[in-house]
UniProtKB/Swiss-Prot annotation:
Zinc finger (RRN7-type): 19-51
Lineage: Eukaryota, Viridiplantae, Streptophyta, Embryophyta, Tracheophyta
Organism encoding this protein: Oryza sativa subsp. japonica
Ranges for region B-reader: 51-80
Composition bias type Pro residues, residue spans: 77-87
Name assigned to this protein: TATA box-binding protein-associated factor RNA polymerase I subunit B
Amino acid sequence: MDDDGGGSPGHYGGGGIHLVCEYCGHGSEYAEDDADDGFFTCRQCSAIHTSTQNTATNPFDFPMTPAHLSAHRRPTQPTPTPKPFPAPRGAATGAAAPDFDDLGEPSEPRDFATGANAWGNPEDVAARVRWRYVRGLQVILQRQLEALVERHRVGSLAASLAGTIWLRWVAASKVFDEMWVHKMLAIAASVEEGHSASKDKQSELEGDAQKSQSSYEFLFLRSLRMMLPVYSTLAVCFLACHVARETILPTDICRWAMEGKLPYVAAFTQVDKLLGSSLNDCPLSSRQLFRPTRVIGAWQLEAAAGSIAQKIGLLLPSVNFYLIAQRFLKELSLPIEKILPHACRIYEWAMPAELWLSSNPGRVPSRVCVMAILIVALRVLYGINGQGIWESIAQTENAVGSDPEASAPHSIEPDSNNSEEFDARELLCTLAASYDKINVGHDYSKEVHSYLKYCKDVVFTGMTFSLEEEHLIDIFWDMYKGKEVMLLDENAKLCQEKLRTTNGVNKRCRDGRFADTKCCSTPLGNCALQSIKSKMEENGFCYVSPRKRLVSDGYLLYTRRESSGSLIYVAHADYYILLRPFAKLAEVDVRVLHSSVLKLERRLGWIEERVGRSLNTLQNLHDEASDDERPVSD
């Protein structure tokens, strides 16, 4: 607004202003409201007057200090000419206002990244990164133990043991060694010397300082991840469960970590909630520090647990064979009261070294050894030594035809003359049914909806989206839900049509004509036998026909046969049916379990041979002693 007294307009935006365009030469009067984002536009050519900007500031919003007294003075008398703008505060010769640094405020905006020199020298950066990394791993371990106790029914003893193991593991890793920083700086210096030799002098600018700072940070992080890997929290959890005699297996830990039921992949989001933002005390974000590249496998996890126990000097017991074997038998629907006592005798007699954790990643896991003991116990109890039990089951199914009730595995009538054969037949039928029921897949892979939710909550957690991206996501979700409903309706219609056309009249044979199911179906026994042969070939096994007669009462040791330039395993069908569900439950290859069974049987045969020799020696000593005590006749 204009001054009624004819004084000059205030410098903070009052009154009008006359501007002349630099391009077209047109001059015009502009008011305060004519500015667009602080700039005035020519009314003739629409050019922007860059020389003048409307700041719309009020001098009364600032404190009246001696340095500001000359900034504005309310005009009380008309003056012929306006006073010039005051000089900047930095150029004032008088007492200047205090800087922002003196008021305790940061010199840089908080919304922007910190400068290269904000974290101090490399020693301070190393200390900050190391302290944040170790504390963050401890928070992740704490969350994992809480999930094990609350969701997976692990005892509190395992949680208390994990704390002690973790502290000893951190101490053994020497992550807080005073010489660690100097070693890392020496490595970084040698790397920089190699790079500086290939650069010219003009490249050594201020931007190189920030690059050097970043290289230091990631060098420290790489070293910390080698000494204390992120997956070491999972290894400590499994090791604590092992010492506490829990039935938790490495496969359970890996599956829960992959599915998000155990905080691991997305655990870095919980670190900031407990420790605060990492930007306050560490140049690296929590995602860079604790985001794992992949989930470790079960074999590597067990080897990592054994390595930690070896480094901290922890004497480990063997696996809890009784509870783990009981769990496996229960999942396979096998009689626990009959099988478990015999398996425990073999365990106490043989005591194989594979039942203890090892730091060797190439050794057979301990759960495979437990499975091998159970398989040997089943072979001894039920006499599964290649007598053709599965072939007899296939012939029985072929005889009963296509009647589903008569061909069911559990509908076989027992033979009163040979109850052991019936037990073996029922065992193989139960194992064949249990093999199809075992589900080793992840929960998120069951359907697309659960997989998308898994990706949102676990894989891409911590990522932010714009409003437009969120709107597109909502649109795609609505499209997916609509198509999903349509697919469900179509599947329901197809199921109803199949039920109508599979009653024995409208079923189409391969030649294109409709006939009864019996006229075009192959014998069920031949189908079952051909199916098991093809599956054996896929898994590296060769089918062997049943044995006609037993050569000996010892263990049946299978050898390997050369086929197409490679060695493959040979086995009978009944033994393969016994082997297959145990391997699937242990999540290992069938050949690995087969090799473990052969190794255990050789060990048992060697022990039995040594025991027999010892008994014979004792008997001979007893006979010699009795001969010496016998009186000599005249």
